[in-house]
Structure formats: structure tokens, C-alpha cells
Amino acid sequence: MNALIAVQNNAVDSGQDYSGFTLIPSAQSPRLLELTFTEQTTKQFLEQVAEWPVQALEYKSFLRFRVGKILDDLCANQLQPLLLKPLLNRAEGALLINAVGIDDVAQADEMVKLATAVAHLIGRSNFDAMSGQYYARFVVKNVDNSDSYLRQPHRVMELHNDGTYVEEITDYVLMMKIDEQNMQGGNSLLLHLDDWEHLDHYFRHPLARRPMRFAAPPSKNVSKDVFHPVFDVDQQGRPVMRYIDQFVQPKDFEEGVWLSELSDAIETSKGILSVPVPVGKFLLINNLFWLHGRDRFTPHPDLRRELMRQRGYFAYATHHYQTHQ
């Protein structure tokens, strides 16, 4: 298992009262905050959105914002700014979100509604070509024959950014645990760029800004290659990344060696967090300066984990990738 970084004081005022939810620092890192909706908020939200099945959210995209407004109204309109503030804050940028009373696979549709509401308070989730919807649900089992590491249980899924092989801006990534059976291990792995001890070395390398080709396997349903550098800067000139080791295609020896060394430097970082995510909870991270992955599982013939993801853009910020949008 990867090492945890030391717990430090967090800027969040744990004594502040919020309406409908709590917000506290996590045990893993001062950069990761835990937001929990109260049982009453959860119950009222599900009652007020019950008239819309998930299919309605799929077909009518404006309803995704409607359910977001319902959730924010239940939280006295404190929720939206308190989601955006840490997500746009370089010192934080990550939330672990939970709703009391949503914790069973039988509530999978309710989980999708909740995650959709949260995501559409900060921006809009992009079309996911793998699923054909604005979200994707997928299952990890003990045996896998797919064409990427996404569903392979017995190895580490290396740290990466999402949205590397599409042209849409991918500011945020949301990853929700829908089901888990006969499961040991498989924690989420996170690395904040500013906690990566080799950032300066690789960010200043001549290849850091060279556009490289990114190509996805057939399961992603994306046939067009995209070109962009591994590193870029935000509006304030700070490093951001668009990187995944599986899909970047080096054109020559120089690029291949550099990418291999970069991968090793990321995977061996002492700043990696190992974060358990129970059923019903989800991580929401700033994709520009957080890398994410997954630790390996302990083998079991009936192992099963179901996940849901959404990824999209912030509607309230302009500091995307500055040179290669």
C-alpha cells in the first residue's frame, strides 16, 4: 500500500455551521475535504427529485441543473460557493462527498442523481463516449479481458489525468462507488502536483511542452487522435498536467525514454495518498493539478465493484490550460 502524507492543519473552519451539510478536513490530507449531507437533506432531496428518473436527466440536460438547484436550495444556497471555493483553490482542490442514508447498490439511481446535482453546481459534465451518456457506470470483476487498465483488479491503475484523449476541457473528475462485494484493497490513489517531489525537474524539461499524440483503445469509442503537451500552465503560470501513461504515443526514442522516466517518478512519489471510498461516497477533484489512480485488489472469485464517473468543465473559472486548449 502506498504511503500517506502527514496530516496538517487545514484552512477549513471546522466550527462553522452550514445548513444541510458538514465540511471538515479529511484524515488523509489537508488538501482533501470531506463534505457530508445530513440525513434530512438527503431525504428531502430524494423526495423532490423523485419525479425524474435517471433517463429524464439523460434526455433533458437542463434537468441536471434543476436537481443541482434543488440541492443547493435545501442547503440555504451555501453549497454552491462551498463546492467551488476548495475545488478552485490550488492548496486544496479535492472533496470526498457523502450523503447520509445513501449507501447501498439498490440506491444506484439515487446515487447518480446526487452526483449529477453536485457536478452541475460547479459546471457541466461532458459527453462520455464510452457510455454514450454524460456519465459512465462500469464494473470491476476478478477476471478482466478489456483493452485498458480501467477494469483490471490485480494491478495498480497508475496515476493519471482524465480527458487526455478528447478535445473537451476536463476541469473536474467525479468518481463514485456504487457497489462493492468481496473486496479488499482497491483504495483510490491521489497525488497533488505540488506534493510531487519531482515536479520542477519534469516541468522544466524541454519535452514538457512538446505536443504529443494521445490515442485511446477501441473501448473508449474515440477514433480521433489528439495532440497536446504533457504539461501546461494555468492562468497564474502554475504547472498543470494532461497525462496518462496508457494512451500517450511517443513518436521517437527521446520521447519514449522521457515518458518512461516520468511514469516511474510519479508512481514512486512519497506524496501519494491512499483514500478508501465506501459505497455511496464519491471523490470530486480538480483534474488540472490532481492525478488519480487505484490500488490493486486482493483476488476473490466473486469480487465486484461498480463505479460511476463524470468529468467536465467548471462554469465559473477561466484558468484552464493556457497554451493548448
Swiss-Prot record:
Pathway connected to this protein: Amino-acid degradation
Free-text remark on how the cofactor is bound: Binds 1 Fe(2+) ion per subunit.
Gene3D superfamilies xref list: Clavaminate synthase-like (3.60.130.10)
Cofactor: Fe(2+)
GO BP terms, alphabetized: L-lysine catabolic process
GO terms of molecular function: ferrous iron binding; glutarate dioxygenase activity; oxidoreductase activity, acting on paired donors, with incorporation or reduction of molecular oxygen, with 2-oxoglutarate as one donor, and the other dehydrogenated
Enzyme class: oxidoreductase
Matching InterPro entries: GlaH, TauD-like_sf
Coiled-coil parts of chain: none
Keyword Amino-acid biosynthesis: no
Enzyme Commission number(s) from the entry: 1.14.11.64
Residues at which Fe cation binds: 160, 162, 292
Catalysed reactions, semicolon-separated: glutarate + 2-oxoglutarate + O2 = (S)-2-hydroxyglutarate + succinate + CO2
Subunit structure: Homotetramer.
UniProt-listed NCBIfam families: PRK02963.1 (NF002814)
Known role: Acts as an alpha-ketoglutarate-dependent dioxygenase catalyzing hydroxylation of glutarate (GA) to L-2-hydroxyglutarate (L2HG). Functions in a L-lysine degradation pathway that proceeds via cadaverine, glutarate and L-2-hydroxyglutarate.
Homology family: Belongs to the glutarate hydroxylase family.
Name used for this protein in its record: Glutarate 2-hydroxylase
Gene source species: Shigella boydii serotype 18 (strain CDC 3083-94 / BS512)
